[in-house]
Amino acid sequence: MFTEDRELIDRSFKFLLASRALRSVALILVNLSLSLYLKALGYGLIFIGIVYFFIVLFNVLITFTLGTIGDRIGYARTLLIAEFLPLIALFGLAISENVRVIIASAMLGGITGSPGGIRGAFSPGMTSYIASNWPDERERVEKLSKIYATASFAAIGGSFLLATHGYLSHYFGTINSFRILFGISFILTLGSLISLSFLKETKRPKKTTRLMKKESFSYSLRVMIPNIINGSGTGIAFPLLPLWFELMYRISASYVGAVFTVAYAFTAAGSYFSGAFLNAKNIRAITVSSLARILQGLMLIAIAFTPLLFLSVILYSIRSFIAGIGTPMRSAINVRGISGEDYGTASAVQGIFTRSSQLTSGLSGYLMSEALDLPLVTGGFLQVAGALAFYWLIRSWEKKHNF
């Protein structure tokens, strides 16, 4: 997988895009479906929230393990190893409706319930792979924007498949229809795994520390602190968001899929806009990405108090467009001050704190059982606070380093 031929590395990028597209369809489908599936099986909100707590907890361990070995064995190999986990998980979900198998599979596959359009883009080693092979920040943002736009556009396929659930239910029943969809996700993830086997990457610099350099850790702290705040909000607001739409507006799983289909189209447009326009102009990335996150939080709060479904869909779609703009820039900023030999470990450590903060997903079901709007309002306020902290910490680093 290692090569010094830049042309080969650049040409292999298309296989990463293909992988992210297939992975996005599969994981968006299962992330949107899991809470609805558990509810259809008869489990309550508090139980579902607790399930997500353990899913996130296990995902923390996986993120750290795969991230740290990536600095030593290469990020393309890390991506390949990481893809085996959801493949096994989706097989388990497809063949059994036993709750123990469902929980174990969801934990192994990292099915955290996040319904964001770029969910399929992320796996351990992805950001590190981009940072390692394209050191120029503008080029990184361009590559990340293409990945996020591709994943978001492909996510429409995942939400569309969920929208077919109502049709399938007429023939196979509610539960078996979910399992059929999980089987389709398994096949798509297998395609993603095959695509990743064609990736090429530049040879890794020799690792000189057991964990990471002091300057890399110092910069990572500036990323981790706001990510803890934001991750707490994400954990509270998003795992049960598809279920929130179902309960708030009394719509079926098929209609939930339609809602997110619209939102993912807007996320894809935002990611394309970020890479094609904002990255080409003299715009400060930290300002744009922080403002985008603030607006995301405020709009989440507004959605919580929206009584009409069509208004909620409009607000969530606009929020998704804004998320598409900010995410590629934030991803590039996260590795800006990291040494080349520490990309994987730094991303893993940052991911640990972000994922750990999302253990608040255990509160999501409890808050929703008390009042439907509580998870969204709480999560929205935390996103705003996290964005303000991110801007202050990164901007102070930029000033110190005349960036």
Tell me what each language-model feature is.
Residues 111-135, 325-338:
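Intracellular juxtamembrane helix-capping segments at the cytosolic ends
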Residues 62-74, 166, 270-283, 368-369:
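Helix-to-loop junctions at the C-terminal end of transmembrane segments
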Residues 77-92, 287-301, 380:
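Structural signature of the two symmetry-related core transmembrane helices
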Residues 2-60, 219-260:
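Helix-loop boundary and gating motifs at the non-cytosolic
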Residues 50-68, 261-274:
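Central cavity-lining transmembrane alpha-helices of secondary-active solute carriers
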Residues 144-163, 351-361:
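Glycine-rich segments within core transmembrane alpha-helices of 12-TM secondary carriers
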Residues 21, 89, 99-121, 311-325:
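Hydrophobic core of transmembrane alpha-helices in multi-pass small-molecule transporters
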Residues 61-98:
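Conserved MFS/SLC helix-loop-helix module at the cytosolic interface between two early adjacent transmembrane helices
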